[in-house]
């Protein structure tokens, strides 16, 4: 396997494992795929849910794991035990900014409100030109089909630019998704492409 263009990838995913075994397997598969490509992991910390599965797989594979977690969520009762390096932050805003700062790309596994919020924020940042990093959606068993249908409806109704729809890179398996991310070239029209953005501009 050729050398990856990425050193670290941020993975967004659920703090629960979901009801299907396929979600569990996909998290481990993604962790193993990162290891195979010599990519380190950035994630939201803890050892529960899909977050715990992907981080443990990367850690067991000998790659570096960075868990970024608000101090208020660091108790084992809430998040379990983070493997690898723990980077405490003050709040959720700092968590997202730090994860973005440390990463070369983003991938979302199945998850709930938190995962959706993190995913949509980095998509928005890409649209604005704040970053040029690929955003991948691991669409396990069609989990995100309804979200993609909604986004397509927003394009149809004129709320999302057609070129901005291309920000999202989607695939059903980790290997296929990683192959697509490796080849990704930004070609959408950024809203603020002439601005030199830094994380400080985000108010974090």
UniProtKB/Swiss-Prot annotation:
The answer to keyword GTP-binding applying to this record is: no
**Reaction equations catalysed:** N(6)-(dimethylallyl)adenosine 5'-phosphate + H2O = N(6)-dimethylallyladenine + D-ribose 5-phosphate; 9-ribosyl-trans-zeatin 5'-phosphate + H2O = trans-zeatin + D-ribose 5-phosphate
| One term under GO cellular component | nucleus
InterPro entries registered for this protein in UniProt:
LOG (IPR005269), LOG_fam (IPR031100)
- EC number annotated for this UniProt entry: 3.2.2.n1
Q: List the Pfam families.
A: Lysine_decarbox (PF03641)
Tissues in which the UniProt entry reports expression:
Expressed in roots, leaves, stems, tiller buds, shoot apex, immature inflorescences and flowers.
Instruction: Output the SUPFAM superfamilies linked to this UniProt entry.
Output: MCP/YpsA-like (SSF102405)
Residues that coordinate or bind substrate: 77, 95-96, 112-118, 124
Going by the UniProt record, its keywords in alphabetical order are:
Cytokinin biosynthesis, Hydrolase
What is any one GO biological process for this UniProt entry?
cytokinin biosynthetic process
One of the record's GO molecular function terms: cytokinin riboside 5'-monophosphate phosphoribohydrolase activity
Family the UniProt entry places it in: Belongs to the LOG family.
Briefly, what is this protein's role?
A: Cytokinin-activating enzyme working in the direct activation pathway. Phosphoribohydrolase that converts inactive cytokinin nucleotides to the biologically active free-base forms.
Tell me the protein's name.
Probable cytokinin riboside 5'-monophosphate phosphoribohydrolase LOGL10
Give the source species.
Oryza sativa subsp. japonica (Rice)
**Protein encoded by which gene:** LOGL10
